[in-house]
Amino acid sequence: MVEVLANPSRLPLPWVRVQSRMPAGLGFSPMSMREINGGLYHRSFFFLAPRTRLTRRHQVRCLRRGDYRLTTVALTAGELLGLSALDETLDCDAHLLVYPRLMDPEEIPLPCQSFLGDVLVRRFINPDPCLVNGARPYQPGDPPRMLHYAASLRTGQWQVKTCDASADPKMLVLLNVARSARQWADLGEQDTQVIEDALSLAATVCLLAIDRGAAAGLAANTTLTDEGEEALLLPDRSTEQKDALLSLCARMTLKMHRTFPAFLAQLTLPPGVEDVLILTCYEDEAITAQAERFREQGARVVCHLLEGGESHG
């Protein structure tokens, strides 16, 4: 953080205090911090000689992922004896996004590694339903969405579409920010860390997929810090998608917006998504039913239970 103060007058300013409220997720030198009414405030003191300009730099440690904004700064200046002082509040617009910690590939759990590996393999061999090149007779197990009705009418028997191989696989990671099916209150510190680790896992898997040519997206049953916007990023494999993904992760509140089964029920899979990774601390019949709905739409669904997770039916 950089503070710049100037004194253009011919008279000195014996002392100037700059004070601003800081989020707990940002760390400064303990000597410059003070707790007031439960909030942390960063304070700096200056002596400004006549017609001088001072620049002071502070090292900031990003302790937690988040979306941090500094909107006002309180400025106080006084004379040498401290008998009088002038106060002024200045508006500012400082904005800092702290991204989640990314895992090393070796830290990714085996089920998620296998899921990612299958997505990348099918990048070269997976049929793309948008690239129809003909038809063949129906076989047991063919999904209903692949029926070729025009060819079936011509031949008098059921036909299914045949497709060229796809070079653009799409995957979607779905994160459950609730620790249990009965949770309604905010997460405790220990539970919050479990979900933070899950968010790091989700971001790492998506970025690895994008780096290797696949399209990846992320959604969660929570909202973002600004205006309660739902946490949803549709799959893409562009370079800009990586920045958008990290920004989304930084802005997530981890406060449950709706139950995970309700979130899944209202979710419509984006066109072309054939791989879905669910990250959740628990799995019950309601979640299983929604996962089965995605499978009926032709998607491969993998449900990974997070640390200490439980399966109930």
Q: What spans do the regions from the language model cover?
A:
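An amphipathic, basic-hydrophobic helix/alpha-beta surface used to engage anionic
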Residues: 1-228
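A charged helix-plus-loop insertion that forms the helical arch/lid used to bind
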Residues: 236
